[in-house]
Amino acid sequence: MTDKKYIIALDQGTTSSRAVLLDHNANVVEIAQREFTQIYPRAGWVEHNPMEIWATQSSTLNEVVAKAGITSDEIAAIGITNQRETTIVWEKSTGTPVYNAIVWQCRRTADITDKLKADGHEEYIRNTTGLVVDPYFSGTKVKWILDNVEGAREKAERGELLFGTVDTWLVWKLTQGRVHVTDYTNASRTMLFNIHTKQWDDKMLEILNIPRSILPEVRNSSEIYGQTNIGGKGGVRIPVAGIAGDQQAALYGHLCVHAGQAKNTYGTGCFMLLHTGNKAITSKNGLLTTIACNAKGEPEYALEGSVFIAGASIQWLRDELKTVHDSFDSEYFAQKVTDSNGVYVVPAFTGLGAPYWDPYARGAIFGLSRGANCNHIVRATLQSIAYQTRDVLEAMQSDSGERLQYLRVDGGATNNNFLMQFQADILDVNVERPVVKEVTALGAAYLAGLATGFWKDLDELRDKARVERTFSPDSDNEKRERRYKGWKKAVKRSLEWAKEDEE
């Protein structure tokens, strides 16, 4: 216990940067949020400006302190959680990025991953890194930058460049270039990290021709990495004391810290993690084996299913189809009809993630009849999020041999009661929605707070956790299985759609 009153979690996401101020009871006191530009240079390419990421994130940090009317000497620590895999390479001496951040959604390196498969590296990558060979992960993005940005490879070989995922970039900027680190959870998403030895893997660096000198030091998710000054009275220096990739942070924020506990985060993408304790389970069903947070001692493991498009499909309804005015309208319009009228939406806008891993899949609407209307499409789009979650759960249960008893949920789309009820129905398990919705930020705050003595231990945190609503499934198993069978048929027809165009 300390005399400090607050923890700040920096939640650097795919579409916005947020700062969340929490008190000792793990209640959200204040939030500041700023969106930033999404850059689409070509079909399937997605970039961010690293300087804009930093500008929005640093401004929200200052803003949340100002909005709350507090001073920096009341803040115990800062925890960071971030969009994972997104790749930044910058000059060590100037801090200037050599290229835009290549975002996790970006598919530009599909040709590199195809070559990795053709060269027979799939099994080694799966066994060593826990990952499948896919453009999603950082390794091929780093290679692309070094191969395609003029002079980058030569600078990297001379030790003049640094690589980092977004957490590394933020810590570098917060500490004014003094600290170049990542944590185990983010390192495990690069395709460059051996999750068993917990070291950067020399063979992967050789395969992708990436110099070791650009890599950050890998540290635990809960420790003091450095300090930052955000002004205020006396300009007190505040410890940066927690780092976790967004999905692992959410798992920790739900206090899913034991084998068999699972959560699903409904953000831009949809991410389900099942904690597997100290056992790294190699999936036979297209899931990832990844590292989970542990505030004390060695990091542990989880199985993860990554769905690329979840909340982004609701944005698509709003921005491109213009069938809803804002994301909150989707629940209203989905309930204007009693069913989806046989319509299925497969939102494979950037390919399909787990358990299919097909970068050439594309989005499609199936089952349209003359009676289908916009409300059916809205309803089917929401249902697609729940169907994709079931795809992942089926794979998890097969790999782990365990039947899930409940699913803890977080993310913006969990405010949609229609979606949460349909999720419970299609999974046939209880879905638990917590009182504090900012679970990803909560996880980062917990990690930073435990590292600095703001909270004593997990037992203290468990006493603060509360469920706001439990959604229980309906008992109609025949309807559940009929609907899911239709989804599987729709997905099958979406696979490899773009492959011929790119050959």
Curated annotation (Swiss-Prot):
Keywords for the protein's UniProt record, in alphabetical order: ATP-binding, Glycerol metabolism, Kinase, Nucleotide-binding, Transferase
Biological process terms in GO annotation: glycerol catabolic process; glycerol metabolic process; glycerol-3-phosphate metabolic process
Regulation affecting activity: Inhibited by fructose 1,6-bisphosphate (FBP).
GO MF annotations in UniProt: ATP binding; glycerol kinase activity
Pfam family, one: FGGY_N
Pathway: Polyol metabolism; glycerol degradation via glycerol kinase pathway; sn-glycerol 3-phosphate from glycerol: step 1/1
TM region positions: none
Binding site for ADP: T14, R18, T268, G311, G412, N416
The enzyme's E.C. designation: 2.7.1.30
Record-listed glycerol binding positions: R84, E85, Y136, D246, Q247
Positions that bind ATP: T14, T15, S16, T268, G311, Q315, G412
Record's catalysed reaction(s): glycerol + ATP = sn-glycerol 3-phosphate + ADP + H(+)
A Gene Ontology term for the protein's cellular component: cytosol
Binding site for sn-glycerol 3-phosphate: T14, R84, E85, Y136, D246
Alphabetical list of NCBIfam families matching this protein: glycerol_kin (TIGR01311), PRK00047.1 (NF000756)
Family in the record: Belongs to the FGGY kinase family.
Role according to the record: Key enzyme in the regulation of glycerol uptake and metabolism. Catalyzes the phosphorylation of glycerol to yield sn-glycerol 3-phosphate.
Official protein name in the record: Glycerol kinase
